[in-house]
Amino acid sequence: MSTSTEKRSKENLPWVEKYRPETLDEVYGQNEVITTVRKFVDEGKLPHLLFYGPPGTGKTSTIVALAREIYGKNYSNMVLELNASDDRGIDVVRNQIKDFASTRQIFSKGFKLIILDEADAMTNAAQNALRRVIERYTKNTRFCVLANYAHKLTPALLSRCTRFRFQPLPQEAIERRIANV
């Protein structure tokens, strides 16, 4: 895609997507989380992740930027992004998530990544089914569960993830980011 085509397509995006950080270096205000997650990746030991905290603190931006750094051009083959508030039932876990997790990539090495945004909106039955999928496909797939409210997730699901609390952004971080818009 040409640069002018990319520019035109970005012009039509919602503001929040148009200015979403593309790399971890562009994510502001969550330095401890980013440092720790980068260390996991560098050591080849990325666990299943839970990013939780108030809306607008960079949870989705952080995991998408990390995935883009890990997979590069293979992003679309190796990453499944779902908004669990849209697809919150057990059928999505049994079908879409399980199918993606169970399929091995022939030409790509490493694990696949499933990003579940707003997972705190999933039903308990869906969360319990997800726990079983995580256990079964852990050799092949990593999961990043994103939630505003960790207390709405089942204890079984919480216990399978390394938890990171995203803090509200300091005023200075907000001002720095706005300066780039």
Predicted features and spans:
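P-loop/Walker A NTP-binding region and its immediately flanking N-terminal helices
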Residues: 1-179
